[in-house]
Design a protein with these regions (language model features):
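Short glycine-aspartate micro-motif
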Residues: 82, 108, 168-172, 194, ...
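Short beta-strand segments
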Residues: 84-85, 144-146, 171-174, 198, ...
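Glycine/charged-rich beta-loop-alpha catalytic/anionic-binding loops adjacent to active sites
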Residues: 99-113, 198-201, 322, 362
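A structural preference for long, well-packed, hydrophobic secondary-structure segments
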Residues: 91, 97-101, 107-141, 343, ...
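Acidic/histidine-rich catalytic neighborhood of metal-dependent amide-processing enzymes
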Residues: 114-186, 230, 392-394
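Acidic/His- and Gly-rich active-site-bordering loop/insert found
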Residues: 2-111, 132
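Metal-dependent amide/peptide-bond hydrolase catalytic core
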Residues: 3, 20, 38, 91, ...
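Short, conserved micro-motifs enriched in small and acidic residues
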Residues: 108-121, 150, 212-215, 367-374
């Protein structure tokens, strides 16, 4: 296994060098071309599929997004296996210069290296590794690398759900922990709430009483709705974006607030939406109007029996090499594409085949643990061989 570390680090270095923020279409096009080239070199039939956000998306509103790369190869086995990861990262263009690829002890640093360049590197490494092992006892091997996961998979989610209904097993390569190695059987559902308040403008000095301050009403609604969350039940609502006013001496006539919502189950979102719609009926500023939109961005991943069989098999594979692998069966606030794959699954879905790391979605330098690399290609290839040949039943 140790001989896989340096080649995989070399792949990571090339991937990290290409900035691929979610709205950086040029960078995403460069990276998707590289990924397509690597998959074609491994004998996969590759499609580069353009994506677009739906017009009703509260933030993206029909925007063109980065393209997905989808590759397939037929084998002689019994089951179809799909590996998924995402090439886009949360950071904006130009931040790569502040976080170049470097290795310091057991830490390999780089922009997006943990979320999810490490996962992409593992997938690109696992496919030729299967060839080296001479293994083709799968009915079909599929790879999907999308480019919009960090913005809710607005253009790729439906396609991932379709593939989940066609493949016997879906392996998702998000990061596999930090202090401990694990695989996941649960992720949170995610929603976007947008609240638009309309009031009436007036001069802030001479006639503020004639205005209807949309900012005041927005503040009232935001503070009031904070208490609708329930951390003990995994329901979180956090207002993260606010826009109002343009001129200092004018009472603002409009205001917009956007919230990020996380829940353990899809039904929790239904209850929260109903509570929010009831809450906005209680207004502080008379003669203001409030428009609320509640967009379900990502479903929850809820494991089925097949997923649990896969998780236990992953533990057994780790035990073969004398290592421990935890199974996380409770969502902790993060959402992933495993949820889309698990909406109408043909078989099992398992999350977190990626590398252990730290710093994703934060101001800290992002890194993966070099010591976490060696077991992961072994886990991925063993899972493909066990599943593809029909060695697991559920």
């Amino acid at each position: 296994m140790a001989q896989q570390v340096q080649p995989l680090l070399a792949r990571l270095k090339k991937l990290v060098a290409i900035e691929s923020g979610s709205r950086d279409l040029e960078g995403l096009a460069t990276l998707s071309a590289l990924i397509a080239q690597r998959l074609q070199a491994s004998g996969l039939a590759v499609q580069v599929l353009p994506t677009q956000a739906p017009g009703f998306h509260p933030q993206l509103k029909g925007a063109r997004l980065g393209s997905m790369v989808y590759g397939t190869r037929s084998g002689a086995g019994q089951r179809k296996v799909l590996m998924i990861a995402h090439m886009n990262i949360v950071y904006t263009q130009g931040m790569g210069a502040k976080q170049p690829f470097r290795i310091d002890g057991d830490k390999a640093y780089g922009l997006g290296i943990s979320d999810d360049k490490g996962g992409v590197a593992l997938v690109l490494h696992a496919v030729p590794l299967l060839d080296q092992l001479g293994f083709k006892d799968y009915a079909q091997l599929g790879v999907l690398i999308n480019a919009d996961e960090e913005i809710g998979s607005a253009g790729s989610g439906a396609f991932i759900t379709q593939l989940g209904s066609e493949y016997d097993v879906v392996m998702s390569f998000e990061g596999g922990g930090f202090t401990e190695d694990y695989v996941r059987l649960a992720t949170s559902s995610i929603a976007i709430v947008e609240m638009k308040i309309t009031g009436n403008a007036s001069h802030a000095g001479s006639s503020p009483e004639r205005g209807r301050n949309a900012l005041y009403e927005m503040a009232h609604q935001v503070l009031k709705s904070r208490h609708l969350g329930d951390d003990a039940k995994g329901l979180k609502i956090n207002w993260t974006v606010g826009n109002t006013g343009e001129t200092r001496n004018v009472i603002p006539a409009s205001a917009t607030a956007i919230a990020d919502v996380r829940a353990l189950g899809n039904e929790d979102l239904d209850r929260l939406e109903a509570q929010l719609r009831e809450s906005i009926k209680d207004k502080r500023i008379a003669d203001t109007t409030i428009e609320l939109s509640f967009y379900r961005s990502r479903p929850a991943f809820v494991a089925n029996a097949a997923s649990r069989v896969l998780a236990r098999r992953a533990q057994d594979i780790y035990a073969e090499i004398g290592q421990k692998l935890d199974i996380r069966d409770r969502a902790t606030g993060g959402g992933t594409d495993a949820a889309f794959a698990g909406l109408r699954p043909k078989g099992g879905v398992l999350e977190s085949f990626g590398l252990r790391g730290f710093g994703a979605h934060s101001s800290d330098d992002e890194y993966i643990l070099v010591s976490s690399i060696a077991p992961r290609p072994y886990l991925a290839t063993r899972m493909v061989t066990d599943v593809g040949s029909g060695g697991l039943s559920w």
